[in-house]
Structures are given as structure tokens and as C-alpha cells.
Amino acid sequence: MATDGESISMSLAVATCVAMALFYVLILYVPTVILRLPSASSYTEFMIRRFICAAICTVASLVFTAFILPIKSWEASYILGVYGIRKDHLWQGVVYPLLLTSLVYAGSLVLKLFTLLESWKENGGGCSSFNYIRSFFQTIPASVLTSASNVSVWRNFIVAPVTEELVFRSCMIPLLLCAGFRINTAIFLCPVLFSLAHLNHFREMYIRHNRSYLRASLIVGLQLGYTVIFGAYASFLFIRTGHLAAPLFAHIFCNYMGLPVLYANGKGLVSAAFLGGVVGFVLLLFPLTKPLMYNDSTNDCPCWLGYCLWN
């Protein structure tokens, strides 16, 4: 293990990051290709296998990263802090990045409001609307229980965001920064590696969903473009705040919302809201992610904390 004053080589950092990205994808095929297990009998079993593989990859990446980084203490709180897992300034690390991210979805949120109002009108307003609202809240417990047993919900909102942010943000960014890469380079290099973890979607589209080669390429190409953009934003949040919670909750929110709605037929306000939200996002990007809002000090930081260099 290196000491706190040492650094790591750029070649070692890049090789480690590439290896972790490939491992994150290839381990998904271990059950059938290497262990020779029979094909999953159900979608639930298939996803549970993938959850286990992703968890193993994540733990291995965290341990390997800890031995490469110039860490001076093995105390749990110190190690967790290296990965951005902290309890101090937690509400700031969740709320402010979520508010910032929601600005990009202003059009989507306005469209949802229109849908809610139309539903209210269809129910006649007044007492009928209160009955509708009461009925809605009564269905929440059942919806929660249904979601808790839905593997797709676990994949989209728990397993994928947590494992991806731990591997591609908590592990890779400290490695790149301690290797001497510039902050901007780390921000845009991680998303490229992040997109590699989604290349297996082409196989799923082409083989499992029986898409044509061209259609599968277009769909996956769009997904890769989106993951690169989001990955850069998530890396930006992680470096600026020093909090894993910032990109993690932004990731979950984006998975829930999907692609931002740019326009809707007959609803010009949706487009106006989207444009206004984008302008607000650009204007508030740096003010809402000031390092001092999320940290007690921005001086004398270890090499893996980039916010000291970007205060």
C-alpha cells in the first residue's frame, strides 16, 4: 500500500479503470459461460444472477482500488470517505444536486402536471377529485409492495445506480486524480468507460429482443450518447461535492424520469419549461455545486479529492 504523499502512474490508473469497466460487463456472463450453469428459468432468476455478479464486481473494485490508492489509514470512516460515502453534509449532497438535475426535466414535470389536471377534470373536480386523490393515496401501500418484489425496479433504482456509481465514480475518479490527470480529463474519461458497461445492451437488443442490426445499433448508439453525457455530469457532481450521494440520487432520478420531454403536441408551455429549465441548469450548475457547500474545508486534501483543486 502506498503512503499518503505518493501518487500512482497514469498507465496503472488507466489500465485499472479499463479492467474494472470490462470486468463489470464480462462478469455478467460468468454463470453461463464459465460456471456452466443452465440458463435462467425465469426473468427474475436471470436478474438475480446479474445482481450477484454486479455486487461481486463492485466489492472487488472497491478493495482493489483501496490497495492502489495512497491511503494512510484503514479506519472504516476514512476508507468510506475515499469513496465519497459520508454522513456529513448529507442533505446538501442529496437535495441540491436533485434540484439542479430536476431543472433539465422541467418540461417533463410540466407535462406530468398537465396530465394530472386533465385527470382531475375528467373526475369532475370538487368532491370527485378528493375521492380520486384519496383513492390514489390508498393504492400507495400496494404499489410499494409490488415494486419491492419487482426485479426491474430493483435493477433500475437500486442495483444499477449503486454499483455503477461505486465503480465508475467512487473507484475510477480517485484513481485518475491521484495519477495526475486534470479534472476535466477525469470528468470526460470516466463516461467513456461508463459507456463500455452498456455495450452488452447491443447483444440484448439484437438477439434477445430480435431487433435488426441497424435498429439495434441506433438504439444502443443513442443510449451510449446519453450515458456519456450523464456520466460526465455525474463525475462533475462527484468531484465538486466529494459526495457519492450527489451522483447516486441524480442517477436514480434520471432513471425514473427517462429522457427529458422537449415538447408535446398542443402544449407549448412544455417546450418553454424545458428551455427555461436548461437555462436555469446552466446558470446554477456551478453555484449549486460549490465545494464549500458540501465540505468543511477545501484545503490540504488528499490527491483523490478533486474539489480542493476546483474551489
Swiss-Prot record:
Q: What is its EC number?
A: 3.4.26.1
GO molecular function annotations of the record: endopeptidase activity; metalloendopeptidase activity
List residue numbers at the site (Transition state stabilizer).
Answer: 251, 255
PANTHER family per record: CAAX PRENYL PROTEASE 2, PROTEASE U48 CAAX PRENYL PROTEASE RCE1
Give TM segment ranges.
14-34, 51-71, 94-114, 173-193, 219-239, 244-264, 268-288
The lineage's top-level taxon is Eukaryota
**How is the protein disposed in the membrane?**
Multi-pass membrane protein
Question: By what name is this protein known?
Answer: CAAX prenyl protease 2
According to its UniProt record, which reaction does this protein catalyse? Hydrolyzes the peptide bond -P2-(S-farnesyl or geranylgeranyl)C-P1'-P2'-P3'-COOH where P1' and P2' are amino acids with aliphatic sidechains and P3' is any C-terminal residue
Q: Which UniProt keywords apply?
A: Endoplasmic reticulum, Hydrolase, Membrane, Protease, Transmembrane, Transmembrane helix
Q: Name one GO biological process term.
A: protein processing
Q: What is the lineage of its organism?
A: Eukaryota, Viridiplantae, Streptophyta, Embryophyta, Tracheophyta
Pfam families with a match to the protein in the record = Rce1-like (PF02517)
Q: In which tissues is it expressed?
A: Expressed in seeds, stems, leaves, flowers and siliques.
Location in the cell reads:
Endoplasmic reticulum membrane
Q: Which GO terms describe its cellular component?
A: endoplasmic reticulum; endoplasmic reticulum membrane
**Modes of activity regulation:** Inhibited in vitro by L-1-tosylamido-2-phenylethyl chloromethyl ketone (TPCK) and N-ethylmaleimide, but not by EDTA.
Family, according to the entry, reads as follows:
Belongs to the peptidase U48 family.
Gene that this sequence comes from: FACE2
Q: Where do the catalytic residues lie?
A: 164 (proton donor/acceptor), 198 (proton donor/acceptor)
Described by its record, this protein's role is as follows: Protease involved in the processing of a variety of prenylated proteins containing the C-terminal CAAX motif, where C is a cysteine modified with an isoprenoid lipid, A is an aliphatic amino acid and X is any C-terminal amino acid. Proteolytically removes the C-terminal three residues of farnesylated and geranylated proteins, leaving the prenylated cysteine as the new C-terminus. The substrate specificity is only partially overlapping with that of FACE1. CAAX processing is likely required for subcellular targeting of prenylated proteins to the plasma membrane.
Q: Does the keyword Calcium apply?
A: no
